[in-house]
Swiss-Prot record:
Organism lineage string: Eukaryota, Fungi, Dikarya, Ascomycota, Pezizomycotina
Biological function: Multifunctional protein that encodes the first 2 enzymatic activities of the de novo pyrimidine pathway: carbamoylphosphate synthetase (CPSase; EC 6.3.5.5) and aspartate transcarbamylase (ATCase; EC 2.1.3.2). The CPSase-function is accomplished in 2 steps, by a glutamine-dependent amidotransferase activity (GATase) that binds and cleaves glutamine to produce ammonia, followed by an ammonium-dependent carbamoyl phosphate synthetase, which reacts with the ammonia, hydrogencarbonate and ATP to form carbamoyl phosphate.
Keywords, comma-separated and alphabetical: ATP-binding, Cytoplasm, Glutamine amidotransferase, Hydrolase, Ligase, Manganese, Metal-binding, Multifunctional enzyme, Nucleotide-binding, Nucleus, Pyrimidine biosynthesis, Repeat, Transferase
This protein's name: Multifunctional protein pyr-3
UniProt organism field: Neurospora crassa (strain ATCC 24698 / 74-OR23-1A / CBS 708.71 / DSM 1257 / FGSC 987)
Residues annotated as binding Mg(2+) 3: 1252, 1264
Length: 1832
């Protein structure tokens, strides 16, 4: 078998000269090609891999690597360059400061990618490549190092040789490598096995040399001389020397074979080194002699450890592939503690051969191999790992102290030479006795409540993990969490779930009721922590133990002062700050802090009065302003522009401590980490930076006493090693969810176990199943987290980013390069983003946007780069590390180059396409660059064999085999990690959490996956949101952490050969790609995407409702202000207005008058044919009702109805829902059920769907229908105890299930769902409810009635029941009247009422005592007792009911009403605010009834049982066919016979036909009928289409072949027709003579259908063309049709032009060659109808830009007077991707087919190409026509 050759796996560095290829050949013959970046030469050696993520300068200078080719598993190498070779070490005087020896020892270096000259670090003086060249060491990048590591892991260490490309043999496309027989292109050299040489002799010092410590710190011998360590240098790393010298001993370094028996010394140290200890006999003899004498303590490291063991008489063995990494756990046999160590060795001591008197000191916690030995009664010990680290963690450096202390003691007391070494940290037995396991049977877990900004889905994930862990330990778990939308609160997780507020009052009640043994407060975010702090002193009395981190620790971390003091006590520093109440105090404070400082006004919200001061003048100015707003200012050291770095730290009760993941913020300090782009692991920290912060993290966490998991954030000065601790979160946080997903290490699961006292080393790594959980993951990929903001949803919100978090969700992406990962992340944020490219959006000026970051920052960087800004200029403005900026600049430059090419240029350049994919560009983006379309690029890519590879996330960088199904796609690789035999069902997740689509869709996805798995299906989850349970790797059989877009889903679907794609559970994200997936040949499970489109296209949906007789509010799409005005007058105000292209209430507004309409339309959009608006009649005071249902094949099999508390007009996502409904009349309910059944049948739904109705006086109307799971599914499923998603999944998969199952809840009782808002985080946003959704989450509670449930649910959102003062401000008279009884009730209950002017007058008239308050002018406002703002500011108001008069359309931002001002103040001062009259009424009633609430078993009830329905008959079709109409038994000869109503009937029946065909129904409408087809001209399509149509309707066909018939004998047409009429019920005729239709009309006794009369007409083609336009674009009205080609003889065009006169607003453009123009009479029709827009002989970009329907016809040679005339125009109308770049993104390309050259094949892959679908629509249309003509 030929050995495998792999082409380079990554793109070459841009803008750098190519240094040639290198081929890495292995002993087994496989060859990996890559790019050279070191010395241009070939070498051979032993191939080894190292899994550390930092520290390449230290590693390559480590003498232990002598002769080895080093493979670094972390893919990004060279990022922080190389420090100066000249700088000498302060301690070692003549040795270099930054390296482990004075030369590079590796033979060669192999990496996946390389940073080139774009390195970034304040100490760097050159790139890695430059240094390697200086030292003559070859290096290569572009190798799939993961694949290579797996090969070494499986086969063991092997020999390799790096062969340089021959200079004279250039390769045309280096990125494709040299395929096939590569050897002639590369040099060749002999194999070398370094282990056969004495490598130690090469690296050891040549003669003894003495190093002395600083006299001030020197340790002395009793005789007065310095304490001396003799070091045997068998390949010593300089840091071992540094560790000794800085501890005050002098070191005599001796060569490896030196006989040191004559030397005077106090301790013997044997260093690390390379090679096999077997060849070192001389050294072993010298050590043996020292052991015999036992004059001094002895300590060995690495090779020194192996030599000591051999000298003692033990044996050593060669390991399969060695241990080389920075994360290897070693357990001490003395203390039982587990330490994370740095290692680099290929041999080990065989512990079974240790002689008497010796025992194991450390063992490897992963594989049990020996890691250290000690003598029982002599001071001799050694370790296999590197306690001096560099690179790696410094956790075991204390062993140097142990050794030196032992040496010092032995010099004063030589009896100690007869004793073993003493180690700190107690014994294993003592430690286990001090920290026993916690014995608990029942644990209470506090959840986090509703999702809000700053506290979102990550707690669903971490809470679910914690419960899984507790269940695994057999503990009964009780959860309090009112968040009904999450998996955490589902059946099957916790044993009991309380849907109650997570606050002290209710938690106390639950504890008394449940009597748990223990409680967890660390899995519910800030909410749960606060409760823990409030109840801290009561827990003991309640008999509850706090698990995990102690509450006192939490209090320390939450309180700035306490925290700063605590840090000071261990010598760590926080940001310096001081408070001042005058300018003088501030100036004094600064002396200690130093400039620059940040000044903030204390007690001011939203960062009021804060700013930066760089000098005294600025400080004075700022303080004056701030002190005007507040009595005190805080002055704090400004670290703006510093790097922000985070570590996730885990610690168990026995003090084992690890850091699981470190993260670097792309944005510098100053932006909240939740609003920052975050990269894991850090990219620009050197080993010293990384481990300095890691060591600090471990020290801080140990000092604080955290048990479980926590997060520590630092600010790091990029120009020094100065750092500050910003904060510690002693709980699971957003970062922990991210870290878990980024590394595959299940933090929350582990933390829950640690809280039970289980030590880390006893918990298994669930991914590898063989290693333990006490280790630090090594990553061989890079992860980018990016926030998603939804600031457009709010009025008047500030878009600036700062220290307060504003994002509502986040995405995470994984790649093998930063470019690949960040481009994926940008696309994941929003469907419209294609990647890192300039955006045409309305940004502020680029400089402003870069300096004051907003949610548009990344696009501003792209625009700046596009405009030619340099990396340095952008860095000055943003302070984003230059390494990141250089990477982005590379993308920007590549994109610029690509736009110069077209698809045709790229066809022969697979290397370009490959490079683009390796840089993370998506097909859509490339299609944009190259004027093509996504599917054409895809096809080109597949033909070039360019597809992504699937890689695993395994926590160990491939060092151990992993059983992980956690996967991502990358183009930077050369092989897959997995095989594809499952053929699973793909479930598409919800994508990023945003307003309108949040955790409820994750619940749906997970429930679907669990149902599929329980039913025996293999499952594949696709999602990219790190906060979710669905991206937990144990939920599905395979998890692809990938984007949900057409390209990625197709890639996964085709690789996995999946059985189908289930998209109905993930909300709108999967729905958006359902139709394109279907068209690309994917089996989409559930309702047909064409039906989804029918429900989502307002024209199609509206027509469908009319067809089935379901009412809807009147609406119209309008293209001018006058039309809009006229429509509004007709339907009367108020109306809803919105731009036509948006869904889900984006930019919608309610308009109450013509003046409002005018200003809204000016502000929102210029109304024009390009930008139409949709206006809908707004029905005031109507109830809104939510229907959630499941259907199978169009029959409803389960449903629940919930009612909204608020009237229609509040977005359903912001509404309060009640289930079962309390105020609906039976008739309303029945009408809703009836309408639902009709809609389900018409859309042929299989699976979940949701309909929103409005009802007024029992009249119901449909607002919208979502053919997918909706936001309310978890709520109704949990309240009713019937899992609708499980039912829907079974219906979709054809599994058995029970229709309308029994409802599982006790009788009586109501569930109420209440929205959770986050206005307090969004400074400036107006907290009113409207048609735009604004809530970020939801909660629900249960009660005896709706009032109790509502109050509990409202309290769950943080609402506090008012104690005494209530302020009222009610706008409209109607609301005042409606509120009166409620206000009276408040007064009776003893509340003190305050009100604004109008409200106060009204209440006083009705004898309700009230105090008047007013918003006064600035100067009076401060002191007046009537000041409303002062009452709010001083927290004198407990509840503010502010009911604005009609929520007018959004006013421009500068208009600030008093109402807005006070509403905003209420939010800022955290005063409960109610802005809706219905909410106010139910709230008052609830407060009146339920002053204090008891908890207990809640009784549930349903007020009605759904009726069991018998099979439903579809009457509409029968009705349509039996009604009198103009098709019945009539000829169909010309389009001129038909009206718009006739067309409407034909198309309605065609839609029914389509449903029928899709359901696979056998129809017998025309059973027993016969159709004859008579074609005098050749035809395959039309005849086949009629034949298929007839047969599908149950009829038969006789086709007459005219060329063999009696026609040849001279029979006339009329005779043929009369004869056929004797056999058939109808005839389809095509004839070259235009007058044939007159003959037919005159002589045929049965209906004749014209299939083309010469070049005159082709009516059925025109019908199907119109039907196609309706189906593709929703409507025909208002469209612009462009007809191209032969318009003179193109009969379908003539018919179509005639029919278009029936549709208003249609415009026509004609493009044809001279001589083939539209016939004059047809053209006249267009002119008369006012539809002719333009005529041209060429298809110009302007014409295309206006086109909605591009209709192409054949230009045939025979139509031209001469060959020359034909040749002139032949190619001028060819439609290809190049032409289409000028076309609209939503349009249709049509062609009656067959085609010649008119449309290029590449266009077939464009979503807009409708011509093959046109054929299918034709079938439905002709079925409808035949049925109408022939039935009955």
């Amino acid at each position: 078998m030929a050995a495998t050759v792999y082409r380079p796996a990554t793109a070459p560095i841009a803008d750098a000269p190519c240094e040639g290829l290198v081929c890495l050949e292995l002993e087994d013959g496989s060859a990996y090609q890559g790019y050279s970046f070191g010395a241009p030469k070939s070498i051979a050696g032993e191939l080894v891999f190292q899994t550390g993520m930092v520290g390449y300068p230290e590693s390559v200078t480590d003498p232990s690597y002598r002769g080895q080719i080093l493979v670094i598993t972390f893919p990004l190498v060279g990022n922080y360059g190389v420090p100066s070779r000249e700088t000498v070490d302060d301690l070692l005087k003549d040795l270099p400061a930054h390296f482990e020896s004075n030369q590079i020892h590796i033979a060669g270096l192999v990496t996946a990618s390389y940073a080139g000259e774009d390195f970034s670090h304040f100490l760097a003086t050159s790139s890695l490549g430059t240094w390697l060249k200086e030292q003559g060491i070859p290096a290569m990048y572009g190798v799939d190092t993961r694949a290579l590591t797996k090969r070494i892991r499986e086969k063991g260490s092997m020999l390799g040789r790096m062969l340089l490309q021959k200079e004279d043999l250039a390769v045309s496309a280096p990125s494709l490598g040299v395929p096939g027989d590569w050897k002639p292109h590369f040099e060749t050299i002999e194999w070398v096995n370094p282990n056969e040489k004495n490598l130690v002799a090469e690296v050891s010092i040549k003669e003894p040399k003495l190093y002395k410590p600083d006299e001030a710190t020197a340790l002395k011998h009793p005789s007065g001389r310095n304490l001396r360590i003799l070091c045997l240098d068998v390949g010593m790393k300089y840091n071992q020397l540094r560790c000794f010298i800085k501890r005050g001993v002098e070191v005599l370094v001796c060569p490896w074979d030196y006989d040191f028996s004559k030397e005077e010394y106090d301790g013997l140290f044997i260093s690390n080194g390379p090679g096999d200890p077997k060849v070192m006999d001389t050294t072993v003899e010298h050590i043996s002699a020292a052991l015999q004498k036992n004059n001094t303590p002895i300590f060995g490291i690495c090779l020194g450890h192996q030599l000591l063991a051999r000298a003692a008489g033990a044996k050593t063995v060669k390991l399969k592939f060695g241990n080389r990494g920075h994360n290897i756990p070693c357990t001490s046999m003395v203390t039982g503690k587990c330490h994370i160590t740095s290692q680099n060795h290929g041999y080990a001591v065989d512990a079974t051969t240790l002689p008497t008197g010796w025992q194991e000191l450390f063992i490897n916690a992963n594989d049990g191999s020996n890691e250290g030995i000690m003598h029982v009664d002599r001071p001799h010990f050694s370790v296999q790992f590197h306690p001096e680290s560099t690179p790696g963690p410094r956790d075991t450096e204390f062993l140097f102290d142990v050794f030196i202390q032992t040496v010092a003691k032995c010099t004063t007391d030589n009896t100690l030479l007869q004793k073993g070494v003493e180690f700190p940290g107690g014994t294993t037995e003592e430690n286990e006795r001090l920290h026993p396991r916690v014995d608990v049977k029942k644990v209470l877990v506090l959840g986090s409540g509703g999702l809000s900004i700053g506290q979102a889905g990550e707690f669903d994930y971490s809470g679910s993990q914690a419960i899984k862990a507790l269940k695994e330990e057999g503990i009964y778990t009780v959860l309090i969490n009112p968040n009904i939308a999450t998996i955490q609160t589902s059946k099957g997780l916790a044993d009991k779930v309380y849907f109650l507020p997570v606050n002290a009052e209710f938690v106390r009640k639950v504890i008394k009721y449940e009597q748990p043994d223990a409680i967890y407060c660390t899995f519910g975010g800030q909410t749960a922590l606060s409760v823990g702090i409030q109840l801290k002193d009561e827990f003991e009395a309640l008999g509850v133990k706090v698990l995990g981190t102690p509450i006192d620790t939490i209090i320390t971390t939450e309180d700035r002062e306490l925290f700063a003091r605590s840090m000071e006590s261990i010598g760590e520093k926080c940001a310096k700050s001081a408070s001042a109440s005058s300018v003088e105090e501030a100036l004094n404070a600064v002396k200690d802090i130093g400039y620059p400082v940040i000044v903030r006004a204390a007690y001011a919200l939203g960062g009021l009065g804060s700013g930066f001061a760089n000098n005294e003048a600025e400080l004075v100015d700022l303080c004056n302003k701030a002190l005007a707003a507040s009595p005190q200012v805080l002055v704090e050291r400004s670290m703006k522009g510093w790097k922000e770095i985070e570590y996730e730290v885990v610690r168990d009760a026995q003090d084992n401590c690890i850091t699981v993941c470190n993260m670097e913020n792309f944005d510098p300090l100053g932006i909240h980490t939740g609003d920052s782009i975050v990269v894991a692991p850090s990219q620009t920290l050197s080993d010293e930076d990384y481990n300095m912060l890691r060591t600090t993290a471990v020290n801080v966490i140990r000092h604080l006493g955290v048990v479980g998991e926590c997060n520590i954030q630092y600010a790091l000065n990029p120009f020094s090693r100065e750092y500050c601790i910003i904060e510690v979160n002693a709980r699971l946080s957003r970062s922990s969810a991210l870290a878990s997903k980024a590394t595959g290490y299940p933090l929350a699961f582990i933390a829950a176990k640690l809280g039970l006292g289980i030590p880390l080393k006893e918990i298994k790594n669930t991914v590898t199943k063989v290693t333990c959980a006490c280790f630090e993951p090594s990553l061989d990929y890079v992860v980018v987290k990016m926030p998603r903001w939804d600031l457009k949803k709010f009025t008047r919100v500030s878009t600036q980013l700062g220290s307060s978090m504003k994002s509502v969700g986040e995405v995470m992406s994984i790649g093998r390069t930063f470019e690949e990962a960040i481009q994926k992340a940008i696309r994941a944020i929003d469907f419209h983003n294609l990647g890192f490219s300039e955006s045409k959006g309305a940004l502020m000026s680029v400089d402003d946007e870069l300096q004051t970051p907003s949610d548009q920052r990344l696009f501003a960087i792209a625009n700046a780069m596009h405009a030619g800004y340099t990396v340095d200029r952008i860095w000055e403005l943003t302070k984003i590390d230059k390494w990141f900026l250089s990477k982005l600049k590379g993308l920007s430059n590549f994109a610029k180059d690509m736009t110069k090419l077209t698809a045709n240029d790229v066809v022969g350049r697979p290397d370009l396409l490959l490079r683009a994919k390796q840089l993370g560009f998506c097909d859509r983006q490339l299609a944009n660059f190259w004027d093509s379309n996504e599917l054409a690029i895809r096809r080109m890519r597949l033909e070039a064999g360019i597809t992504p590879f699937v890689k695993q996330i395994d926590t160990v960088a491939a060092e151990f085999p992993a059983f992980t199904n956690y996967l991502y796609l990358t183009y930077n690789a050369s092989e897959h990690d997995v095989s594809f035999e499952d053929r699973g069902v793909m479930v598409l997740g919800s994508g990023v959490y945003r307003i309108g689509s949040s955790v409820e869709f994750d619940w749906c996805s997970v429930r679907a996956i669990r149902t599929l798995r329980e039913s025996g299906f293999k499952t594949i989850m696709v999602n990219y949101n790190p906060e979710t349970v669905s991206t937990d790797y144990d939920e599905a059989d395979k998890l692809y952490f990938e984007n949900i877009n057409l390209e990625t889903v197709l890639d996964v679907y085709q690789m996995e050969d999946a059985t189908g794609v289930l998209g109905a559970m993930g909300g709108q994200t999967p729905n958006n790609i359902a139709l394109p997936l279907l068209r690309a040949g994917v089996r989409v499970l559930g309702t047909s995407p064409e039906m989804i489109d029918t429900a989502e296209n307002r024209y199609k949906f509206s027509r469908m409702l009319d067809r089935i007789g379901v009412d809807q509010p009147t609406w119209k799409e309008l293209t001018s202000f006058d039309e809009a005005k006229a429509f509004c007058q007709k339907v009367s105000y108020p109306v809803l207005v919105r731009p036509s292209y948006v869904l889900s209430g984006a930019a919608m507004n309610t308009v109450y008058s013509e003046a409002d309409l005018e200003s809204y339309l000016q502000q929102a959009a210029d109304v024009s044919p390009e930008h139409p608006v949709v206006i809908t009649k707004y029905i005031e005071n109507a109830k809104e009702i939510e229907m959630d249902a499941v259907a199978k094949d169009g029959k409803v099999v389960g449903h629940f109805i919930s009612e909204h508390v608020e009237n229609a007009g509040v977005h359903s996502g912001d509404a309060t829902l009640i289930l079962p409904p309390q105020d609906l009349e039976q008739t309303t309910i029945q009408r809703i059920e009836e309408a639902t059944r009709k809609i389900g049948a018409a859309l042929n739904v299989t699976g979940p769907f949701n309909i929103q109705f409005i009802a007024k006086d029992n009249d119901i109307k449909v607002i919208e229908c979502n053919v997918r799971a909706s936001r309310s599914f978890p709520f109704v499923s949990k309240v009713m105890g019937v899992d609708l998603i499980e039912m829907a999944t079974k219906a979709i998969m054809g599994l058995p299930f029970v229709e309308y199952p029994a409802i599982d809840r006790p009788s009586g009782g109501v569930g109420v769902k209440v929205p959770q808002f986050s206005f307090s985080r969004l400074s400036g946003a107006d907290p009113v409810l409207g048609v735009e959704m604004a809530s970020t989450g939801e909660v629900a509670s249960f009660g005896v009635d709706k009032y109790e449930a509502y109050l509990k649910a409202l309290m769950s959102t943080g609402f506090k029941v008012p104690k005494k003062n209530i302020l009222l401000s009610i706008g409209s008279y109607k609301d005042k009247k409606e509120m009166l009884p409620s206000v009276a009730k408040l007064s009776q209950m003893g509340y003190k009422l305050f009100a604004t002017a109008g409200t106060a007058d009204f209440l006083q008239e009705h004898d309700i005592p009230v105090q008047f308050l007013e918003v006064l002018a600035k100067e009076d406002d401060q002191k007046s007792e009537y000041s409303l703002t002062q009452h709010l500011a001083n927290n004198m108001i407990d509840l503010y009911i502010n009911l604005p008069s009609n929520n007018r359309y959004r006013r421009p931002a500068n208009y600030i009403s008093k109402g807005y001002q006070t509403r905003r103040m209420a939010v800022d001062y955290q005063i409960p605010l109610v802005t809706n009259v219905k909410n106010a009424k139910i709230l008052v009633e609830a407060i009146a009834r339920y002053r204090d609430m008891e908890i207990g078993e809640r009784d549930y009830q349903t007020s009605h049982t759904p009726l069991q329905l018998s099979g439903q008959v579809n009457f509409t079709l029968q009705d349509s066919l039996s009604r009198p109409h103009s098709f019945k038994k009539a000829h169909v000869l010309s389009v001129e016979q038909y009206t718009r109503a006739d067309l409407h009937l034909l198309f309605t029946v065609a839609e029914e036909m389509r449903l029928s065909v899709q359901r696979g129904n056998v129809m017998d409408i025309l059973k027993g009928r016969m159709l004859a087809t008579l074609f005098y001209e050749p035809s395959t399509r039309t005849s086949a289409s009629f034949e298929a149509a007839m047969k599908r309707l149950g009829g038969e066909v006789i086709s007459i072949a005219t060329q063999h018939s009696s026609v040849q004998k001279g029979e006339t047409l009329q005779d043929t027709l009369r004869t056929l009429a004797c056999y058939a019920d109808a005839i389809v005729l095509r004839h070259p003579d235009e007058t044939c239709v007159d003959v037919a009309k005159k002589y045929s006794p049965v209906p004749v259908v014209n299939a083309g009369n010469g070049s005159r007409e082709h009516p059925t083609q025109a019908f199907l063309d119109l039907f196609t336009v309706r189906e593709e674009l929703g409507t025909v009205q208002g469209l612009t049709f462009t007809f191209v080609g032969d318009l003179r003889y193109g009969r379908p065009v003539h018919s179509l032009v005639y029919l278009l006169r029936h549709y208003s607003g249609v415009k026509v453009q004609l493009v044809s060659p001279k001589g083939l123009e539209l016939p004059t009479d047809v053209r006249q029709q267009l002119v008369k109808a006012g539809q002719l827009l333009c005529e041209s002989e060429t298809l110009t970009p302007e014409i295309l830009g206006k086109t909605d329907v591009l209709y192409c016809t054949r230009v045939q040679k025979e139509r031209f007077p001469s060959e020359a005339e034909y040749e002139k125009v032949k190619g001028s109308y060819r439609i290809d991707n190049q032409t289409l770049k000028h076309a609209k993104s939503k349009m249709a390309i049509m062609h009656p087919l067959p085609r010649n050259e008119e449309i290029a094949e590449e266009v077939d892959f464009d979503q807009r190409a409708a011509y093959f679908r046109q054929m299918r629509y034709g079938l439905y249309c002709r079925m409808a026509l035949l049925a109408l003509v022939m039935s009955g």
